Amino acid sequence: MRFFALFIYRPVATILIAAAITLCGILGFRLLPVAPLPQVDFPVIMVSASLPGASPETMASSVATPLERSLGRIAGVNEMTSSSSLGSTRIILEFNFDRDINGAARDVQAAINAAQSLLPGGMPSRPTYRKANPSDAPIMILTLTSESWSQGKLYDFASTQLAQTIAQIDGVGDVDVGGSSLPAVRVGLNPQALFNQGVSLDEVREAIDSANVRRPQGAIEDSVHRWQIQTNDELKTAAEYQPLIIHYNNGAAVRLGDVASVTDSVQDVRNAGMTNAKPAILLMIRKLPEANIIQTVDGIRAKLPELRAMIPAAIDLQIAQDRSPTIRASLQEVEETLAISVALVILVVFLFLRSGRATLIPAVAVPVSLIGTFAAMYLCGFSLNNLSLMALTIATGFVVDDAIVVLENIARHLEARMKPLQAALQGTREVGFTVISMSLSLVAVFLPLLLMGGLPGRLLREFAVTLSVAIGISLVVSLTLTPMMCGWMLKSSKPRTQPRKRGVGRLLVALQQGYGTSLKWVLNHTRLVGVVFLGTVALNIWLYIAIPKTFFPEQDTGVLMGGIQADQSISFQAMRGKLQDFMKIIRDDPAVNNVTGFTGGSRVNSGMMFITLKPRGERKETAQQVIDRLRVKLAKEPGAKLFLMAVQDIRVGGRQANASYQYTLLSDSLPALREWEPKIRKALSALPQLADVNSDQQDNGAEMNLIYDRDTMSRLGIDVQAANSLLNNAFGQRQISTIYQPMNQYKVVMEVDPRYSQDISALEKMFVINRDGKAIPLSYFAQWRPANAPLSVNHQGLSAASTIAFNLPTGTSLSQATEAIDRTMTQLGVPSTVRGSFSGTAQVFQQTMNSQLILIVAAIATVYIVLGILYESYVHPLTILSTLPSAGVGALLALELFNAPFSLIALIGIMLLIGIVKKNAIMMVDFALEAQRSGGLTPEQAIFQACLLRFRPIMMTTLAALFGALPLVLSGGDGSELRQPLGITIVGGLVMSQLLTLYTTPVVYLFFDRLRLRFSRKNSKPVVEI
């Protein structure tokens, strides 16, 4: 009583406290960063290593395996995967959430150093690492085009100057430059000219390497001067290499230009990048795992004027893709939804109270509670994101509830002609416990979420804390500011003797009278109501089992990623043509704004595309509808497939897959994996629940197997090392020397001129110089036959792995897809040597599915404990919790009606309903218990009177919560796919709960009261006279 009086009788202090809360909130709002979702990125580090010319199997066994054994010892590694292709190995390390990325990077570097002695000696450089997830979509793509500069020169400028500058911006984790490679001097050998001159490829290589050296020469000095010695020991251009003498034949000099074409070109000619229809260099920028995407993009944009100033006029720099506009638009939509929710809630209060002064009180309490929450969000290190702002939108209906309960009770005393200050004090005292019970039990719902681990727990933590803080501030405001404003602003008035004169009052009275009549009938037919109650419990169970489920709603971010997978024997020239064809088909779609892509590198038969769609206001279709339309057109392209998927704000795992979800096969036996993977992939492709089924196992590439005749080689004076060196020199794009320049280092690359290596007959032109100096054709000691070979070798841990990726057809949920895959694996009878499991997002979905029921039960149990402590009763909490089944039925039926799967967002809605719908029961039970204690009423009379007296605040609070959530259901535009499931769940649950709990709660109250009396009679002992 004294606590409430302290604020009611000191209005200045109370107002200043509320103003302080508001000002802190405004300051926090201005300082809060902006993000699409809470920070949920796993720390990921990518290790790269190269050995030009090495086969995928060689890379896997000699490079990947030693590194994996060393990296696998690092603490906190959640998953380690590797992919080895021609001349390249990439290892992805995904760490636990709590692992610091910088500490992990130090451990990775130490592990690389420890494995260095086990790696092949011919590697051009040590393995390197990057603190970025290669499977993440770039946050920004910049393109460089030029009419006069070559692609190699553009690439050099991009990688040497632009990429280095951008990488220094806060938040940038990796700048991947694609579309070409660094400039190089390429030496294209003529096998016939070499044979005629008797010059071996090794001799050419050694001559070039010896002629281009960079060594210190020292200095000369006397007593006065010092002269540094400088020589022309370096060759920098193709023109300088052409006259190089590599051999003497009968006293005549054989120059490099006599046996080879020497050109200024690039290190790897098998690379191509495009933007729309132009050749381009792409700078694909990815953020650090812990970085904020908006702040990083803003930092890059702020740097762009400086970058453009340093770019020559012949180069055009453009932003091809930027993830931030749709994120900003989505957050703006949420902010507008929040404003609409506040307005609707205040409108509901006004319609019920029919007083401007009375409405002003909750109209002040709501913004104070919501704005004050921003200060706590800032102190907790949160961000303004879709989930935290949705929490505030939903909180609108909650925070007004507390003010309504206090205000409505004070207004009742004022109608009884009590003085305003006395009415404020008395009314607040009467419902203070009720308000505290409602708020604490609502906050208790979110305690299990705070203890939930993994990605779902990290994702939901900001939502739970934000909503809990808003409710906590609302509780303080409703018990301090609200009664103070009531006491000083409202006046005593006569009871409304003729409320029918006003429309809302007339409707409310009619509803109350109708409710009273129907409630009497229900209390006389309690068994029927009991059957209905049990039916809702059973229906809950059936609906939860039957409803389709998914992890997270599919987002329309306005960005698509595409992975091209062509025939495994395709040439680079043909693959470049496929890229151009696919880009033209996509560019012609009316919903597409921009398209960029690249192909080449270590995987000739694959490519990547990034598509930016027009803003939502300029296109009618969703991203998924655009994909469905393009899928039909793209299927007509022979010899290659393009798999499209919408970029999501949540991407789990480090695998670069051509679809959104993955199923990984593991085996310690590579032959068993290669035998069963095609069978499993074929069976999964036939499932109607899956689309775009593809695999990263590519073991049907064309290979030419050379079989050495070792006896013949020994007789001819040739060893295997010389033969292998011949092949590497001829066909491996071998980097044989380094050209040092002030800004970068460039390579001299040697191979047989492409004119002489167009088919297998090129092998017949190869020869080795034996120990006697004679040219021995390769065909003298080797035979060759075509065979199949892997284009890549993949590992997970230290096991051979193959990942089958898939998308979901429109109308199919992730739960339906995973169930279909599990059934198929059982039907196929896959042996125990091959193990299958979901990975990435699908894996997290299964883990979440296993914990959902536990989470819901834990929330109910927590609420029961809190209510039990507050009421000092085992029974009354059960009465209050009896409101939950009807809310669950309403929520699940609403999701079914809107064809929305049960996702993590819908789970949040269920958790919220646990907190919302019990408020009705709390108000009923509190007044019934008080009526029994002080009024001497029977339980039947007490609960009946409580239902009628609390009918108006129950209707007000429920409608306030319902209208607070309604904008989420009706919202469109960017990010609506996240907001709608939450709104649908809450609105459906509230409607059904309101219809049923007004009748089931009094029946359950009476049931437990009779049960209590029965047990008390059984346990009572007769008085024994002594």
Curated annotation (Swiss-Prot):
Topology within the bilayer: Multi-pass membrane protein
Quaternary state and interactors: Part of a tripartite efflux system composed of MdtA, MdtB and MdtC. MdtC forms a heteromultimer with MdtB.
InterPro entries in the cross-refs: AcrB_DN_DC_subdom (IPR027463), Acrflvin-R (IPR001036), Multidrug-R_MdtC (IPR023931)
First-listed, main subcellular location of the protein, grouped into a coarse class: membrane
UniProt family annotation: Belongs to the resistance-nodulation-cell division (RND) (TC 2.A.6) family. MdtC subfamily.
Pfam families, alphabetized: ACR_tran
Membrane-spanning intervals of the chain: 7-29, 336-353, 360-379, 389-411, 431-453, 468-490, 853-875, 895-917, 948-970, 985-1007
Annotated keywords: Cell inner membrane, Cell membrane, Membrane, Transmembrane, Transmembrane helix, Transport
Segments on the Cytoplasmic side according to the record's topology features: 1-6, 354-359, 412-430, 491-852, 918-947, 1008-1026
UniProt xrefs under Gene3D superfamilies: Multidrug efflux transporter AcrB pore domain, Multidrug efflux transporter AcrB pore domain like, Multidrug efflux transporter AcrB TolC docking domain, DN and DC subdomains, Multidrug efflux transporter AcrB transmembrane domain
GO MF annotation terms: xenobiotic transmembrane transporter activity
Top-rank taxon, per record: Bacteria
Residues in the Periplasmic compartment per record: 30-335, 380-388, 454-467, 876-894, 971-984
Cellular component annotations (GO), alphabetically ordered: plasma membrane
Localization: Cell inner membrane
Protein name stated in the entry: Multidrug resistance protein MdtC
